[in-house]
């Protein structure tokens, strides 16, 4: 009887283990499906609807990560989600507050944007560490960063891109923090490696990000900036509007080229809906382009 009881215990434990495996498999499948379907938001043209979906999505992705902390798809969704939401919606709130001369509200949204980018970086670095350990040590200088990133391949391009974009964007909203500015090279290296692996990733977003980076000041590498922007526009046949908007906002602004600045932004505003896969990103570009054609924004460029 003792032998039979022992066998029943083994069978019971095996059944419990099997149920746990089934639940994990189902959860992982749901997360994978969510990642595959998450691109549907890009086809929306309604900014407010997209904003609601994006914030709700973050809650869903956080819950998935809580249930499956080692799931790479969940980590990717959180990295991309926090980065994209901060840029598309939180920074939009910040710009509106700035234009309204509401310093308190502007500072509130700037802090929100920084926190969102910090969260994106946290999840992104966690995902990178699952591929290759040693990120914190590698970020000390450009050479060690490039050596670390040599361990990543083409299928890592999107992850590198989203982490890098979050890093660069955080530096932009925290310009008054020397510690953040001192690590700007980390974001550049991440995006550069992504572009090396797949320059078409996310509709050449890496090229546009590098273009903006190299036009960060009037004393920066403006010739290199223009090359990156022109390549991004070439790769997307001019149909992805964010590279064009960013070209005007950064490069033409820093060059003091008012004619090209206005011409490019008006091209963005007047562009037809020819890229449904990037309808939301193009709607965001149009929204920002209209804002940057305002007198106050143009005055910031010295126009």
Model-predicted segments: where are they?
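Bacterial N-terminal signal peptides that target proteins for export
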Residues: 1-10
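C-terminal motif of bacterial Sec signal peptides marking the signal peptidase cleavage site
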Residues: 18-20
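Short coil/linker segments at helix-helix boundaries
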Residues: 31-63, 67-68, 81-196, 206-239, ...
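Terminal, non-catalytic domain-edge segments
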Residues: 292-295, 299-302
